[in-house]
From Swiss-Prot:
The gene is POLD3. It is found in: Cytoplasm; Nucleus. This is DNA polymerase delta subunit 3. Residues 349-361 have a biased composition (Pro residues). Ubiquitinated, but not targeted to the proteasome. Sumoylated. Sumoylation with SUMO3 may be predominant. It comes from the Eukaryota. There is a cross-link at K258, K433 (Glycyl lysine isopeptide (Lys-Gly) (interchain with G-Cter in SUMO)). A motif (PIP-box) lies at residues 456-463. Residues 206-217, 286-296, 432-441 have a biased composition (Basic and acidic residues). Its main location: cytoplasm.
Length: 466
């Protein structure tokens, strides 16, 4: 009766649950001895094949026996499929045992699934792994917990001792106390290549010396005082010179740029057109400016002047920062009004329009309305809009030249005379074009002359210092 229940359980595992049933798995699952599990599997296969000859069952066998190989006899244990059982039996000299190892529905390609099945069941029964086994040893007794803890401590101590020895050996080599390494003497190439190699070695030695001296100077400068700013460090690293000398030169360069900006401001204010100021005052202010510049240059004559490279860089920056802006061309209109004593009042110049990024073409000629005469035949005084250039400093401190329309008063007779003279000498379009070019060149030449004067004074100051 019990055997019948076991066979039904095996049939359920194989057919219904589609499991791989090994003799070890069956012994642990049903709690029977391994030899009994093997016998149960064999009985199940025999009964199943008698009942249904076409039953789909794949069986693996555990075969053991003696084998003569290379003139020596050896004991062989193998797990083979049913189709290879006869071939393995023929190779064995003496067959010791043949047992059913596993039963499954699917055909196995290798022994991996069999190993996984046994591994999982043994892992879940580690404490009683030899309970149902046929191999047993009575002398094998489990250790007490105290003995196991002491043995683990001894193992840890020995492991720590070994690790400390390895660390000591590593420290000897890393800290420089180890045996000196043999120097690899590289053979220098002969001839021209040898000359180049020796020159390269000398250059590397010189660069190492220079870097050491520069590092010493930087440390001395940092300990001496707090005069060196952050910008000085950046500039000294960039130009690759001594730290303290570059700090002084950078301070002088900043002060010189500030003074040049201060000098440029009055020049711009002089060039702004003011109708109320007379021409005599303008000339006197222009003469007074170089005197002020010379006085300021004398005051800072003791300082170190800028080098030629730095002056070129500042001039290039100034040239880049100059911009010429043209306003949008408005439709020009002439205003006609009768001659009166109050018509000679000077108008204030219109404020400069906002700077427009694209440069729009300047209109060459403006349409002039026909001359208007009164019924009495008198000439009328007219207001005419004329395109003039204006220079001023913007918010960034750049010199900006702008074309601005200004109104001028003229009579019909004066206008006719101007038209006649211009038609005799040159076409009217050329006069309108050349006026802004000449006026543009004026302020640029003035600023260039000022820059040259500043540079010459600074160079003379540099030679006086030396």
């Amino acid at each position: 009766m019990a055997d019948q229940l076991y066979l039904e359980n095996i049939d359920e595992f194989v057919t219904d649950q589609n499991k791989i049933v090994t003799y070890k798995w069956l012994s642990y699952t049903l709690g029977v001895h391994v030899n009994q599990a093997k016998q149960m599997l064999y009985d199940y296969v025999e009964r199943k094949r008698k009942e249904n000859s076409g039953a789909q069952l794949h069986v693996t066998y555990l075969v053991s026996g003696s084998l003569i190989q290379n003139g020596h006899s050896c004991h062989k244990v193998a797990v083979v499929r049913e189709d290879k059982l006869e071939a393995v039996k023929s190779k064995l000299a003496v067959t010791a045992s043949i047992h059913v190892y596993s039963i499954q529905k699917a055909m196995l390609k290798d022994s991996g699934p069999l190993f996984n099945t046994d591994y999982d069941i043994l892992k879940s029964n580690l404490q009683n792994c030899s309970k149902f086994s046929a191999i047993q040893c009575a002398a094998a007794v489990p250790r007490a917990p105290a003995e196991s803890s002491s043995s683990s401590k001894k193992f840890e101590q020995s492991h720590l001792h070994m690790s400390s020895e390895t660390q000591a050996n590593n420290e000897l080599t890393t800290n420089g106390h180890g045996p000196p390494a043999s120097k690899q003497v590289s053979q220098q190439p002969k001839g021209i290549m040898g000359m180049f190699a020796s020159k390269a070695a000398a250059k590397t030695q010189e660069t190492n010396k220079e870097t050491k001296t520069e590092a010493k100077e930087v440390t001395n400068a940092s300990a001496a005082g707090n005069k060196a700013p952050g910008k000085g460090n950046m500039m000294s690293n960039f130009f690759g010179k001594a730290a303290m000398n570059k700090f002084k030169v950078n301070l002088d360069s900043e002060q010189a740029v500030k003074e040049e900006k201060i000098v440029e401001q009055p020049t711009v204010s002089v060039t702004e057109p003011k109708l109320a100021t007379p021409a005599g005052l303008k000339k006197s202010s222009k003469k007074a400016e170089p005197v002020k510049v010379l006085q300021k240059e004398k005051k800072r004559g003791k300082r170190v002047a800028l080098s030629d490279d730095e002056t070129k860089e500042t001039e290039n920056m100034r040239k880049k920062r100059r911009r010429i802006k043209l306003p949008e061309s408005d439709s020009s209109e002439d205003e006609v009004f009768p001659d009166s004593p109050g018509a000679y009042e000077a108008e204030s110049p219109s404020p400069p329009p906002p700077p427009s990024p694209p440069l729009e073409p300047v209109p060459k000629t403006e349409p002039e309305p026909p001359s208007v005469k009164s019924s009495s035949g008198e000439n009328k005084r007219k207001r005419k809009r004329v395109l003039k250039s204006k220079t001023y400093l913007d918010g960034e401190g750049c010199i900006v030249t702008e074309k601005v329309y200004e109104s001028e008063s003229c009579t019909d007779s004066e206008e006719e005379l101007n038209m006649k003279t211009s038609s005799v000498h040159r076409p009217p379009a050329m006069t309108v074009k050349k006026e802004p070019r000449e006026e543009r060149k004026g302020p640029k030449k003035g600023t260039a002359a000022l820059g040259k004067a500043n540079r010459q004074v600074s160079i003379t100051g540099f030679f006086q210092r030396k």
